[in-house]
């Protein structure tokens, strides 16, 4: 029997869930060209505006001249170069931990950490709204896998009471589709009381959160004792690419020995590590980026609430606007695009049914005037969408008469 892929694709189209790739024809930044159209983008995760920073670009160029453009081999063969090692030392110091270990992607870091730490006879407990890479890691680990209610320490405690073997509690730091923060102090207390380890994927926290950009752990004033396993990605707040795990000497050595996504892959280009060293320097030095970003977030929320839009409880750069139906979310995104604004429409299965949304993301590279332009376009588009929905309802009522 052949694979009926055409039917699967047709069903996805019929449900307004078909994914397509926009073609970016410019550098990352607020002003982009996508599929030939100039747009003002509010959908990038380049939270501090470092992806196109001249000093980061210069560091990448110099790194390529010195180290070439390929990693060449895995870290355990001959792919662990000087810049990789220097970046690991810098990330360890930045996170206040003995060591850090580089991975090529955030997905690989999450998969590598979970599967190296737990297996058959152990338990992994995850927040229901965790990123797909964390959920996949839990399922693939071979450990008993269960999800607790979103950000609910009591639900976690009930599952911990039934846990067996080594137990790993896993949560996003900032939830990527909602923008809210994990209740780390409460989750850490519950995990510690029951002898479990807490692993936090702070992909969206490093850079925007914390006095020095140290993410959610710094934001809450926690340390390695409360959060033994800390994951960070480098393609968001850092503006480059890759990911890392930070923790104890024993943790990192365990990953070197047992994390298959680390062992069996070519290292990232060393020039990228050179660029990340520069972006880390800028992230720590230029606190004005976090301050400006926080002001833009507050400005956007005031304006969106004045328009009557339904926002989620978030003070991070991720500012979702709840729409409900997938078709309506896509229509609203299309209306914004017609006005020169690019915002992503997020639909099931990425988010729960009937909670489709626009995922607005803000960056320190945006200006107040650009945020005001977004709000103006949102107001016009929301009124247009409401009028269209009302016309559809009236037409349906007419058909039923």
UniProtKB/Swiss-Prot annotation:
UniProt keyword terms in alphabetical order: Biotin biosynthesis, Pyridoxal phosphate, Transferase
Keyword Cell cycle in annotation: no
Pfam families: Aminotran_1_2
MF terms in GO: 8-amino-7-oxononanoate synthase activity; pyridoxal phosphate binding
Cofactor(s) named in the record: pyridoxal 5'-phosphate
Sequence positions bearing N6-(pyridoxal phosphate)lysine: 236
Residues bound to pyridoxal 5'-phosphate: 106-107, 176, 204, 233
Gene3D superfamilies: Aspartate Aminotransferase, domain 1 (3.90.1150.10), Type I PLP-dependent aspartate aminotransferase-like (Major domain) (3.40.640.10)
Enzyme class: transferase
Pathway where this protein functions: Cofactor biosynthesis; biotin biosynthesis
UniProt-listed Enzyme Commission number(s): 2.3.1.47
Residues that coordinate or bind substrate: 19, 131, 350
InterPro entries: Aminotrans_II_pyridoxalP_BS (IPR001917), Aminotransferase_I/II_large (IPR004839), AON_synthase_class-II (IPR050087), AONS_Archaea/Proteobacteria (IPR004723), AONS_Proteobacteria (IPR022834), PyrdxlP-dep_Trfase (IPR015424), PyrdxlP-dep_Trfase_major (IPR015421), PyrdxlP-dep_Trfase_small (IPR015422)
GO biological process: biotin biosynthetic process
Catalytic reaction annotation: 6-carboxyhexanoyl-[ACP] + L-alanine + H(+) = (8S)-8-amino-7-oxononanoate + holo-[ACP] + CO2
Summary of the function given for this chain in its UniProt record: Catalyzes the decarboxylative condensation of pimeloyl-[acyl-carrier protein] and L-alanine to produce 8-amino-7-oxononanoate (AON), [acyl-carrier protein], and carbon dioxide.
Family classification: Belongs to the class-II pyridoxal-phosphate-dependent aminotransferase family. BioF subfamily.
Record note on quaternary structure: Homodimer.
Protein's name according to its UniProt entry: 8-amino-7-oxononanoate synthase
């Amino acid at each position: 029997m052949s694979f009926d892929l055409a039917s699967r694709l047709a069903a996805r189209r019929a449900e307004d869930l078909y994914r397509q790739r926009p073609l970016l024809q410019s550098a990352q930044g607020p002003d982009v060209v996508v599929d030939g159209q100039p747009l003002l983008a509010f959908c990038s995760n380049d939270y501090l505006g470092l992806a196109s920073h001249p000093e980061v670009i210069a560091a990448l160029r110099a790194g390529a001249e010195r180290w070439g453009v390929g990693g060449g081999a895995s870290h355990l063969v001959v792919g662990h170069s000087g810049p990789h090692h220097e970046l690991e030392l810098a990330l360890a110091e930045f996170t206040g931990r003995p060591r850090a270990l580089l991975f090529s992607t955030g997905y690989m870091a999450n998969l590598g950490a979970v599967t190296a730490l737990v297996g058959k006879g152990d338990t992994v407990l995850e927040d229901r709204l965790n990123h797909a890479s964390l959920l996949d890691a839990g399922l693939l680990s071979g450990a008993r896998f269960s999800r607790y209610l979103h950000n609910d320490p009591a639900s976690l405690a009930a599952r911990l009471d039934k846990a067996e073997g080594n137990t790993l509690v896993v949560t996003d730091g900032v939830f990527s589709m909602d923008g809210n923060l994990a209740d780390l102090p409460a989750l850490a207390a519950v995990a510690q009381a029951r002898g479990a380890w807490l692993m936090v994927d702070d992909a969206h926290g490093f850079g925007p959160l914390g006095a020095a950009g140290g993410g959610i752990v710094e934001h809450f004033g926690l340390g390695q004792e409360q959060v033994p396993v800390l994951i960070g990605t480098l393609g968001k707040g850092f503006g480059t690419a890759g990911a890392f795990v930070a923790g104890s000497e024993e943790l990192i050595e365990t990953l070197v020995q047992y994390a298959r996504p680390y062992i069996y892959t070519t290292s990232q280009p060393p020039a990228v590590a050179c660029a990340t060293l520069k972006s880390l320097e800028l992230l720590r030095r230029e606190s004005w980026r976090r301050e400006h970003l926080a002001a833009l977030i507050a400005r956007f929320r005031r304006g969106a609430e004045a328009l009557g839009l339904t926002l989620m409880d978030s003070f991070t750069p991720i500012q979702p606007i709840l729409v409900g139906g997938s078709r309506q979310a896509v229509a609203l995104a299309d209306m914004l695009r017609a006005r020169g604004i690019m915002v992503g429409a997020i639909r099931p299965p990425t988010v729960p049914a009937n909670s489709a949304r626009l995922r607005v993301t803000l960056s320190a590279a945006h200006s107040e005037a650009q945020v005001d332009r977004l709000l103006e376009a949102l107001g016009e588009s929301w009124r247009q969408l409401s009028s269209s929905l009302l016309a559809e309802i009236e037409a349906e009522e007419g058909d039923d008469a």
